[in-house]
Amino acid sequence: MHATTVKNKITQRDNYKEIMSVIVVILLLTLTLIAIFSAIDQLGISEMGRIARDLTHFIVNSLQD
């Protein structure tokens, strides 16, 4: 009986750690997305267009080599 109780507690602790890990990952992804969208918002549309154009030219030039 005691061994079963200990095993159940260990299983509960492992489940708790797994759930907490998932929550931490979700929070980090959320913060990352917020930071990315905030940076995009601060750059403005014209800057984003310029960056996209430069990136497109870089990719095309890389493929032509």
From Swiss-Prot:
Coiled-coil region(s): none
The residues on the Periplasmic side of the membrane are 40-65
Keyword Membrane annotated: yes
Q: What is this protein called?
A: Two-component-system connector protein SafA
Query: How does it associate, per the subunit comment?
Result: Interacts with PhoQ.
The protein's UniProt keywords, in alphabetical order, are: Cell inner membrane, Cell membrane, Membrane, Signal-anchor, Stress response, Transmembrane, Transmembrane helix
Q: Where in the cell is it found?
A: Cell inner membrane
Q: What does this protein do?
A: Connects the signal transduction between the two-component systems EvgS/EvgA and PhoQ/PhoP, by directly interacting with PhoQ and thus activating the PhoQ/PhoP system, in response to acid stress conditions.
Membrane-spanning residues where? 19-39
Query: Induction of this protein: by what?
Result: By acid stress, via the EvgS/EvgA system.
Q: Which InterPro entries match?
A: SafA (IPR031411)
The Swiss-Prot or TrEMBL record describes its family as follows: Belongs to the SafA family.
| Tagged with keyword Plastid | no
Q: Name one GO cellular component term.
A: plasma membrane
- Recorded topology in the membrane: Single-pass type II membrane protein
Which residues point to the Cytoplasmic side? Answer: 1-18
